[in-house]
Every structure is written in structure tokens, then in C-alpha cells.
């Protein structure tokens, strides 16, 4: 895994955890949870690609991995929409910077997951 991406995840999660958005902390906590799950999924998918010997065991063990992959792309799209929504509403520069970076990270992670998944197909 790219250590910069991992650091970016940790940085964004830390900053989000310090925020109090006007909407609700439940929404923000949900986003944080999804970011954490997305990071774990991306890391595990990348590790499977690195250990190509595990490719067949991954496919045999988890016949629904394509469904999971589709679900992760849906989660990414939802997170992107939420980040954009927050960006249109906030005037706080700290929040703007955090969510712009989160948006950029989501696009990078989406690209990484697509690359990993093509290697697994």
C-alpha cells in the first residue's frame, strides 16, 4: 500500500473526528466509519493482488467478492456526494480543506480499487 495514502486516511480521519458540523455528528461519524471500512477493504484487496497465489483462494473463499466490490464503489460514490454536499454548505476553511482532501483521497482510492479489481479479474 502507498504509505502516503495511508497517512492521508489517518490525517483526514483525525481531522474529521475533531469537527462539529452543522448537520449532525451522527452523519459525520457515519462518514468516518465508512472511510475506515474503505481503507481496510482497499488494503486487503491490495494485499490479495500482491500475493497473487491468494487470488484463487480469494475467489474460491469469497464467491461474492464482485458484489462486495460493487458495494464499495457505491459507498465511495456516497462519500463523494457527502463531501461535495458539505463543501457547498460550509464556509469554515478548516472544513473546506479537510473535505477537499477527503474528496481527492476518495478519487485516488477509487482508482486504486479499480486497478486492483482489474488485476483480480
UniProtKB/Swiss-Prot annotation:
Query: Which GO cellular component terms are attached?
Result: host cell nucleus; virion component
Task: Give residue numbers for sequence motif Nuclear export signal.
Answer: 12-21, 85-94
Which compartment or compartments is the protein found in? Virion; Host nucleus
Per the annotation, which location comes first and is thus the protein's main one? virion
One Gene Ontology biological process = exit of virus from host cell nucleus through nuclear pore
What does the UniProt keyword field contain? Host nucleus, Host-virus interaction, Transport, Virion
Q: Which InterPro entries match?
A: Flu_NS2
| Coiled-coil zones | none
Please name one Pfam family that this protein belongs to.
Answer: Flu_NS2
Q: Which HAMAP family match?
A: INFV_NEP
Q: What does this protein do?
A: Mediates the nuclear export of encapsidated genomic RNAs (ribonucleoproteins, RNPs). Acts as an adapter between viral RNPs complexes and the nuclear export machinery of the cell. Possesses no intrinsic RNA-binding activity, but includes a C-terminal M1-binding domain. This domain is believed to allow recognition of RNPs bound to the protein M1.
Assembly information from the UniProt record: Interacts with protein M1. May interact with host nucleoporin RAB/HRB and exportin XPO1/CRM1.
User: Which protein family is named in the record?
Assistant: Belongs to the influenza viruses NEP family.
- Put simply, this protein is called Nuclear export protein
Q: Which organism is it from?
A: Influenza A virus (strain A/Equine/Jillin/1/1989 H3N8)
The upper taxonomy is:
Viruses, Riboviria, Orthornavirae, Negarnaviricota, Polyploviricotina
Q: Which gene underlies this protein?
A: NS
